[in-house]
Amino acid sequence: GGSCGQCRVKIKSGGGDILPTEMGHITKKEAKEGCRLACQVAVKTDMELELDEEIFGVKKWQCEVISNDNKATFIKELLLKLPEGEDVHFKAGGYIQIEAPAHVVKYADFDIPEKYRGDWDKYGLFDIVSTVNEDVLRAYSMANYPDEKGRIMLNVRIATPPSANVPAGKMSSYIFNLKAGDKVTISGPFGEFFVKETDAEMVFIGGGAGMAPMRSHIFDQLKSKKTKRKMSFWYGARSTREVFYQADFDALAAENDNFVWHVALSEPLPEDNWTGYTGFIHNVIYENYLKNHKAPEDCEY
């Protein structure tokens, strides 16, 4: 417990002193206001607490898989259809939880496009079998933005075993095996990674499947809210084959003078003929933007 920091509550009375395990997720100011992690609070006496209003809006739906396509070598875009007339009332940057029953999944059954199969063969991934003997629940950020109604879009990276003694990712293995028409149970919405209502410059930094909340935020700001705040998006990938939604972000940059986006490749391939930024994205944004920024501390990240 205490590792994800998602179960924040405000304790008005009771609950005892805040624990060291909580301080990595809660600032000193928040602690003074009674903020705690519910999983770390021992209930020994009567308590009074305050919950965010959004919690009471959490619902559960059985969705249908519309598509489950590779967007990169190890990343799928899972697109789910909500029941007719239903919608998830979420804020950009929010997440849902997805349920998986006990299952046995053979990686050989995954639908992987030919252009990506070479890497899967190289690492022997099609030989993996994921056996899960209990129900599993995992959280994923939504890649769609609130005005994309009636559906849920997720970017999921397969969690392959780091060694022979460690099992494959229970949920990612389940998700990678989903096919159009399959039924999936989700619940939500949840989240705290929301844009603040200020005029501050926004700097979005992400890589890999971390694309999901970036897409949600940026599309929401530019397509729905029509913000004029200065915005930049810095995305890291291994090679051009691992970059997705490129045409969408190119179009947004062309349509909005206040938005630019940059890609940095850590391992560009010879056929990429890459002339852009290279290296890891956190180093690239520092060296090429934040190092000489007038007031990086004033930006919203």
UniProtKB/Swiss-Prot annotation:
Residues 199-301 are annotated as: Catalytic. One of its GO terms (molecular function) is 2 iron, 2 sulfur cluster binding. InterPro entries: 2Fe-2S_ferredoxin-like_sf, 2Fe-2S_ferredoxin-type, Beta-grasp_dom_sf, Cbr1-like_FAD-bd_dom, FAD-bd_FR_type, FNR_nucleotide-bd, NqrF, OxRdtase_FAD/NAD-bd. Pfam families: FAD_binding_6 (PF00970), NAD_binding_1 (PF00175). GO terms for cellular component: plasma membrane. It catalyses: a ubiquinone + n Na(+)(in) + NADH + H(+) = a ubiquinol + n Na(+)(out) + NAD(+). Binds 1 [2Fe-2S] cluster. [2Fe-2S] cluster binds at residues 4, 7, 39. Transmembrane segments: none annotated. It is found in: Cell inner membrane. Its EC number is 7.2.1.1. One of its GO terms (biological process) is sodium ion transport. Its cofactor is [2Fe-2S] cluster; FAD. Residues 1-45 form the 2Fe-2S ferredoxin-type domain. Keywords: 2Fe-2S, Cell inner membrane, Cell membrane, FAD, Flavoprotein, Ion transport, Iron, Iron-sulfur, Membrane, Metal-binding, NAD, Sodium, Sodium transport, Translocase, Transport, Ubiquinone. Residues 58-196 form the FAD-binding FR-type domain. NQR complex catalyzes the reduction of ubiquinone-1 to ubiquinol by two successive reactions, coupled with the transport of Na(+) ions from the cytoplasm to the periplasm. The first step is catalyzed by NqrF, which accepts electrons from NADH and reduces ubiquinone-1 to ubisemiquinone by a one-electron transfer pathway. Belongs to the NqrF family. Composed of six subunits; NqrA, NqrB, NqrC, NqrD, NqrE and NqrF. This is Na(+)-translocating NADH-quinone reductase subunit F. It comes from Shewanella putrefaciens.
